[in-house]
Amino acid sequence: MENNLENLTIGVFAKAAGVNVETIRFYQRKGLLREPDKPYGSIRRYGEADVVRVKFVKSAQRLGFSLDEIAELLRLDDGTHCEEASSLAEHKLKDVREKMADLARMETVLSELVCACHARKGNVSCPLIASLQGEAGLARSAMP
């Protein structure tokens, strides 16, 4: 692809940014990306700054930031708000660690249930199904 990333149509822009056209339009509706003026009788054009912005959004998404959080990061992107950006990242890191702990607990329980399923003999009820039914019963009895 050419290195000239100026004066791009939306299709070429989307390809350069590694997304599809609908993603570009979605980001515009969400306020993450500007919608360029449409010259009379012509089509909108995008430039390198737009490509960089979309790549920023995608990078932030890969780190788990929501679109609202990304909008806040974009607001801070002049490089002078490192403390605020760091605070956002610390909150995200806390969320990630909590999710990892939840996943570890889920893995332990599932592993135990799989072992119990493999260890069962005869026509005994499936430990996994019994456990899930027990949880469902507890949830029903807790309802008002």
UniProtKB/Swiss-Prot annotation:
SMART domains: HTH_MERR. One of its GO terms (biological process) is response to mercury ion. One of its GO terms (molecular function) is DNA binding. Gene3D superfamilies: 1.10.1660.10. InterPro entries: DNA-bd_dom_put_sf, MerR, MerR-type_HTH_dom, MerR_fam, Tscrpt_reg_MerR_DNA-bd. The keyword Methyltransferase does not apply. Hg(2+) binds at residues 82, 117, 126. It comes from the Bacteria. Residues 10-29 bind DNA. Residues 7-76 form the HTH merR-type domain. Keywords: Activator, DNA-binding, Mercuric resistance, Mercury, Metal-binding, Plasmid, Repressor, Transcription, Transcription regulation, Transposable element. Mediates the mercuric-dependent induction of mercury resistance operon. In the absence of mercury MerR represses transcription by binding tightly to the mer operator region; when mercury is present the dimeric complex binds a single ion and becomes a potent transcriptional activator, while remaining bound to the mer site. This is Mercuric resistance operon regulatory protein. It comes from Shigella flexneri. The gene is merR.
